[in-house]
Amino acid sequence: MILRDPVHGLVSFEEGEESIVPKLMDTPEVQRLRRIRQLGVTSYAFPGAEHTRFAHAVGSAQVMKLLILRLRAIHGELPFWQQLTSDRASDALAAACLHDLGHGPLSHLFEDAIPGVPHHEEWTLRIVLDPGTAVHKALLSVDAGMPERVAALVRGEHPLPYLAKAVSGTFDVDRCEYLLRDAHATGVRYGHYDLEWLLRSLRFAKVEDPSRAPALAIDGAKGLPAIEAFLLARLFMFQQVYLHTATRSAEWMIRATLARAASLIMDGERLAGTPRAIELAAHGEPIPLGEYLELDDAALTVAMHAWESARDPVLCDLARRVRQRELFKTYELFGEQASPAGRERALAVAREVAKKHGLDPDVYVGLDVASDVPVAAEADPLLVVFAKGPPRPLTEVSFLLARLAGQVLSRVRITMVPKLREEVVRALEASGAAD
């Protein structure tokens, strides 16, 4: 199979160990990812962000292929049991292709909106391990043990730590791929870094215990700027894209819409166009895998369009605002006002303004808190190797990353219907909550 890709150029998956990727791509479960946008409603802020989870899955498999080539170029010094054999490579390619298989509509939004809905990681494992799925059968056609091995890799578990971390770790194929693709689609420059040189800089860190497989490390003489650029790119993408005000506002509104619909369904209301999976989730009932796989962006869009004609005026209003991109406005809190106590005071002020206007404060005003740790302080950190001396943790070698390690990037915003914003800001200033 040969494909043209705007991020990676010519992408190919040949016979042998790579043949599992085209097999998986042809399954209904992977094809479903064509109907789920990678960045949800980020296109409300960045019009080009219409790329799909499917494109990311193919790209992740391509990055894994490049990583496998590099690992094989340097694994000759390892004992055979620690080397990347053909069956292990096939498992890794499959895991890279399938790692996001369980995502629901608009990526993370669905699982966050309705309490009790399993997260996408759990759905991914269910799809891989369920004997009735085409994905499971495709894996089974290669090897009877392949579904279990691929599921373990998706969980970040493998006898070879370097392979587990390639699927789920600080420097994994998922992050390597989505940064480049998201930057390309949104038109920003922050997510670009030198993937080719970063892969070229990979080494194995020697371990004293010969029974343990070595960890993957960065060549300190060549790769330090490349890994710094990679981690800083992730930081900048969170600052400028993933936590963008318009995106977060749209996400908040959709969560509010889904929560309102779930509440009405729980109270016995029948909402036209609602997928069966949403009805079950609203009642707190388990969602069968088949019903979950019917969910995609189109199903949710159709449902929300139908909800514009519902009897509940609040649901109608929210659904209409989302479709028309009439986004809620935000007011960002800083310093003491962003602390847990400060944000609650600010929210209370905003709620009082909403009540004064006869609006439901549980719907038309809210607190949006988004956070991430771009450079995690890990117990098992990424290592850097030099010609002399033992491997050292990356954050000990890079003064830039040492300053960032463990730091939480957070945005705390009051979200509200547009007509309330000026009055809310005045009320916050008058109360001292916006000082």
Residue ranges of model-derived segments:
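Aromatic-lined, polymer-binding surfaces characteristic
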Residues: 98
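Histidine-centered, transition-metal-coordinating active-site segments
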Residues: 1-93, 101, 105-435
